[in-house]
Amino acid sequence: MNPAIFTTIILTMILGTMIVTTSSHWLTVWIGFEMNMLAIIPILMKKYNPRSMEASTKYFLTQATASMLLMLAITINLVYSGQWSVTKPLTPMASITMTLAMAMKLGLSPFHFWVPEVTQGTQLSSGLILLTWQKLAPMSILYQISPTINLELLLMMAILSIAIGGWGGLNQTQLRKIMAYSSIAHMGWMTAIMAYNPAMTLLNLXVYILLTTTXFMMLMLNSSTTTLSLSHTWNKTPLLATTILLIMLSLGGLPPLSGFXPKWMIIQEMTKNDSIIMPTIMAMAALLNLYFYMRLTYSTSLTMFPSTNNMKMKWQFNSTKPMTYISPLIILSTLXLPLSPMLTLLE
């Protein structure tokens, strides 16, 4: 793709998200979503092949349906309240329709079917944008409508997302699909706390984006897309392979890594609000995620796949790929929770 065109597309995508997050008028919110959707489709098709074409078509159809639901919610709200303002409370019917539209855009269950397929059909760099940047705009709308949101609907989708995010990843060997199912589960945790403490949702989103970005960047560094190619990383760069696996465990929420902090805080917040059964079910469902990440760690580091002698000698050669920008991400992705008590010393 022409660099000038690619830069324009990226800027349009960023502008679309910024319009959504900063708008106070529902029509400009819808325009921002459309700009964002139309800009990311060429990014998904960057490597032109039938698989990426299929992925971008699935993404377009899903997002177009979600945009239609969004416009329906805006129209219902306009008819019953006469308001275009984002800051004004939504009517109950408009709130439910808006929540469903945002759930479809985020890939929450039961609207999750497109996420693994689209992520698997694209390059790692496109998958990174899809699972991180594309979550910002819908999450900002959910944050703004959180006072009028339907609690039962939100909690039902959250529980389903956490459970399906765990079950779906159990039998996967493709790393992009594993990351996609992990994303579905993380979205479930974020929406579960949305009605209780919206600010905690933003904290969870920030940690999720940090962990997912680090994991994708390290997979891009090794060109790893399957568990088999990840296991060969152990022969080439053992230290890098160890770091990848630590980040995977952090994504699974294993204490004392960074990924455990938001889950811990969400369970604590829900318990304070006299909700005991919900966080218990969520914690049990999250064990599925942790299980497939631990199985990935075991198969990669504690077992050795058949390989040639030449492959076993690669660790002796220095890697020429730049790693300076990844180092701070690795530290934040693994050590934010252990180091966080030390922040009190700065006060």
UniProtKB/Swiss-Prot annotation:
Domain of life assignment: Eukaryota
Presence of keyword Membrane: yes
UniProt record, GO biological process: mitochondrial electron transport, NADH to ubiquinone; mitochondrial respiratory chain complex I assembly
Keyword Ligase annotated: no
Keywords per UniProt: Electron transport, Membrane, Mitochondrion, Mitochondrion inner membrane, NAD, Respiratory chain, Translocase, Transmembrane, Transmembrane helix, Transport, Ubiquinone
Transmembrane regions: 1-21, 25-45, 59-79, 96-116, 127-147, 149-169, 178-198, 201-221, 240-260, 274-294, 326-346
Membrane topology: Multi-pass membrane protein
Entry's Gene Ontology molecular function annotations: NADH dehydrogenase (ubiquinone) activity
Pfam families tied to this protein: NADH_dehy_S2_C (PF06444), Proton_antipo_M (PF00361)
EC numbers on record: 7.1.1.2
Cellular compartment(s): Mitochondrion inner membrane
Family: Belongs to the complex I subunit 2 family.
The protein's assembly and partners: Core subunit of respiratory chain NADH dehydrogenase (Complex I) which is composed of 45 different subunits. Interacts with TMEM242.
Function: Core subunit of the mitochondrial membrane respiratory chain NADH dehydrogenase (Complex I) which catalyzes electron transfer from NADH through the respiratory chain, using ubiquinone as an electron acceptor. Essential for the catalytic activity and assembly of complex I.
Name of the protein in its database record: NADH-ubiquinone oxidoreductase chain 2
